[in-house]
Amino acid sequence: MRHNQMCCETPPTVTVHVKSGSNRSHQTRKPVSLKRPILKDSWQASEKNAHNNKPKRPRGPCLIIQRQEMTAFFKLFDDDLIQDFLWMDCCCKIADKYLLAMTFVYFKRAKFTISEHTRINFFIALYLANTVEEDEEEAKYEIFPWALGKNWRKLFPNFLKLRDQLWDRIDYRAIVSRRCCEEVMAIAPSHYIWQRERSVHHSGAARNYNRDEVHLPRGPSATPVDCSLCGKKGRYVRLGLSSSSSSSSDIVELTGKRSQELHNSLSMDMIGDPSQANTYSQVANDHQSKKENETNFVKKTKSMGWFAESEE
């Protein structure tokens, strides 16, 4: 976070030079028409002096981010459940980079300690961010089973109370500007959570009124639903396991599992339509190429080495 943005309301480069009344008293009096400007100048001078004597204040509250706070936030994404949750949100409709940045800002505004950087607080803050920013209400309900487990239907009223408590703790300042989000992301731009770009066709206030297609929430036991906008089989999104918790072999195993699922799915399609055999070969090759790119990405990216070091 840049600390050179402490700007007072009056631009510091503006200087007003006004002659004092004592200098004017020794001057030869002009016609009476100058008396009113003299009074006006005196009033303006006192107004400017009173304004300049006010203590300089920043234009708005600023966040001072400590290294250990950002490190604790990033460690949340070492959680297997949160990683699976992000993989499930393959279209980045619930947890794109801006919503995740808002989640971090809520942690800061709530003055969470390191011990309060927990899974449940992450989901509560993310739910609040969705409530504030997203027009589509149904998508955020997917958070319930991930945060609360199989008994989420009994527990979600208490979850909403915790959301309200967080809202109160941040003094009801739930709006986060785009600029603030981008400055948070600029601290460690190479981290994989800041690569979660939402597609344009999932932006804006576009509702889906066909309730028979998908029943939400689906929970951790379900696979990501096919997206009619991103393609029949959905959009492949980099899970981006952090280097601190997972090696390249982990993502190879994961992509291998997805590849097998794709193979089985396409094999069933071929049974119904043998003419798709050539298409399957091309899709499988494309998927293998993507898998290799993901492996290379994990090997090359050491995104959070700076945060892993102890402060000097």
UniProtKB/Swiss-Prot annotation:
UniProt keyword Phosphoprotein present: yes
Keyword Nucleus: yes
Molecular function per GO: protein kinase activator activity; protein kinase binding
Name the record gives this protein: Speedy protein A
GO CC, one annotated term: chromosome, telomeric region
Gene name per UniProt: Spdya
Residues that bear Phosphoserine: 221
Organism the protein comes from: Rattus norvegicus
PANTHER family, alphabetized: SEEDY PROTEIN A/C FAMILY MEMBER, SPEEDY PROTEIN A
UniProt subcellular location: Nucleus
Family indicated by similarity: Belongs to the Speedy/Ringo family.
InterPro entries, A to Z: Speedy (IPR020984), Speedy-Ringo_regulator (IPR052316)
Subunit structure: Interacts with CDK1. Interacts with CDK2. May interact with CDKN1B/KIP1. Identified in a complex with CDK2 and CDKN1B/KIP1, where it interacts primarily with CDK2.
Keywords: Cell cycle, Developmental protein, DNA damage, Nucleus, Phosphoprotein
Domain notes: The C-terminus is required for CDK2-activation, but not CDK2-binding.
GO terms, biological process: DNA damage response; establishment of protein localization to telomere; G1/S transition of mitotic cell cycle; male meiotic nuclear division; meiotic attachment of telomere to nuclear envelope; oogenesis; positive regulation of cell population proliferation; positive regulation of cyclin-dependent protein serine/threonine kinase activity
Principal cellular location given in the protein's record: nucleus
Function, as annotated: Regulates the G1/S phase transition of the cell cycle by binding and activating CDK1 and CDK2. Contributes to CDK2 activation without promoting CDK2 phosphorylation, by inducing a conformation change of the CDK2 T-loop that obstructs the substrate-binding cleft prior to kinase activation. Interferes with CDKN1B-mediated inhibition of CDK2. Mediates cell survival during the DNA damage process through activation of CDK2.
Origin superkingdom: Eukaryota
Region listing for Speedy/Ringo box, in residue ranges: 67-199
Source taxonomy: Eukaryota, Metazoa, Chordata, Craniata, Vertebrata
Positions of post-translational Phosphothreonine modification: 223
